[in-house]
């Protein structure tokens, strides 16, 4: 497969991944499928939305910073069997931006999983308060809340917020890994296309 077809395949593959990352990040603002938590965030000193959600890892990092490079990479691959040297060179830079964005999304998703959601829970004094009850354990160890579903009922509100966050942040984590791999591969593909030139239908170099 020549470099142009590879670029086209990578560009097309990145589109749904970027869109999915944007959707996941937007959904995270509405735990329990309710708008009141995002509207009440920071009112009265209470944070009702998980901090990692507000970092916009999926929206900006895995979304916009991957979607824009995907458009260029896809366009580069449309020019015959493979793109021209200049286009392939530029695709390396765009793919690098995609790597940075997807890594940012990956890191934020990891933090979101490790720290756990912001929710209403009972503190040590049996008072209901907004906070992050699972944040004390910051490692994916056996004691992590991720491996202890029975502890998820610590969160009183939003309803089922732990499951909600775990599912969406896990999806963002997987999307970030796939985007990073595809963008990194395009950097290598673009380098070959830039150095070796373009190929036409009959395998001729331009």
Question: What are the roles of these predicted feature ranges?
Answer:
Residues 2-125, 172-195, 200:
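Signature of small four-pass
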Residues 150-177:
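Individual transmembrane alpha-helix segments
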């Amino acid at each position: 497969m020549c470099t142009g077809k590879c670029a086209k395949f990578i560009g097309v593959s990145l589109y749904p991944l970027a869109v999915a990352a944007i959707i996941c990040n937007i959904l995270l603002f509405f735990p329990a499928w309710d708008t009141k938590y995002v509207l009440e965030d920071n009112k009265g000193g209470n944070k009702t939305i998980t901090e990692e959600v507000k970092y916009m890892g999926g929206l900006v990092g895995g979304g916009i910073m991957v979607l824009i490079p995907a458009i260029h990479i896809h366009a580069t691959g449309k020019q015959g069997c493979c793109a021209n040297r200049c286009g392939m060179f530029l695709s390396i830079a765009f793919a690098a931006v995609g790597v940075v964005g997807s890594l940012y999304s990956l890191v934020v998703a990891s933090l979101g999983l490790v720290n756990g959601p912001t929710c209403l829970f009972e503190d040590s004094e049996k008072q209901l308060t907004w906070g992050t009850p699972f944040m004390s354990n910051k490692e994916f160890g056996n004691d992590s809340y991720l491996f202890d579903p029975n502890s998820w009922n610590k969160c009183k509100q939003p309803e089922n917020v732990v499951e909600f966050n775990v599912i969406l942040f896990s999806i963002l984590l997987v999307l970030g890994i796939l985007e990073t791999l595809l963008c990194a591969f395009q950097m290598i593909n673009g380098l070959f296309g830039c150095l070796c030139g373009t190929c036409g239908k009959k395998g001729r170099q331009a």
